[in-house]
Amino acid sequence: MRYDSICEAFFIERPNRFIAHVLLDGDEVVCHVKNTGRCRELLVPGARVVLSRGANPLRKTAYDLISVYKGERLVNMDSQSPNAIAAEYLPRLFPDLTSFRQEVAWGDSRFDFCGVKGGRSFYLEVKGVTLEQADRTYFPDAPTERGAKHLRELTKLQQSGTDAYVLFVIQMQDVLSLEANRRTDPAFADALLAARAAGVGVYAVDCLVTPDSVTAQSTVPVLFL
């Protein structure tokens, strides 16, 4: 996926989940943060960030904060990008894919994708990953009851005979592994273990991130601890 009208700035502060103050060409500017997660390890004062100018001139904020440099590594933190990346990546993940749809309801949940591959129906949920420590990535970065619920629903699907998958889209490149962040959310970690034991397919892919694009790159090992 690609972004239009990008520029770089320096992060100043984040007064709430939705906006950040940045220094752009010497001026302090308020921008929209396209991720309501904490991202405290990324958004530190002075960090270089990438902004994308919004297309609507009537918006309250002219820019979206989409990526941030953590050292030399550029991390995409747009919470809407993982689904777009996954849509581009699905034909590579499933070579026998024949069709898919997005945002499909099942039971009390809504899954990111439903499709057909090899003549069988499947459901797939996508999780975006931005938390990295020593080249290892973790999900989630904050407790997510919704995430654990999705895994339980995927487990039910798999047990009922329908193929179910979860895809972790790691919004950076050159990482060693992905694992559930048990310290932050033990319920999610347990749900992931149970899903895998039931036969749910668990995949992770890292991404080539540039200032104006994000593209799925290489499969990453998922560690179950």
Q: Which residues are covered by each model-predicted region?
A:
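Flexible glycine-rich surface loops and low-complexity tracts that mediate binding to linear polymers
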Residues: V44-N56, D206-C207
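Domain-level recognition of nuclease-like catalytic cores that cleave nucleotide substrates
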Residues: Q171-L225
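A short acidic/basic microdomain associated with nuclease active sites
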Residues: L93-W106
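Beta-strand/loop nucleic-acid-binding surfaces
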Residues: D27-E41
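Short nucleic-acid-contacting surface segments enriched for D/E, G, S/T with interspersed K/R
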Residues: G37-V50, T155
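Nucleic-acid nuclease catalytic cores
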Residues: D135-E145, T155-T184, D206
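Short aromatic-glycine-enriched beta-strand elements
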Residues: N16-H21
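Conserved catalytic cores of phosphodiester-cleaving nucleases, focusing on short active-site segments
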Residues: A9, F111-D141, L154
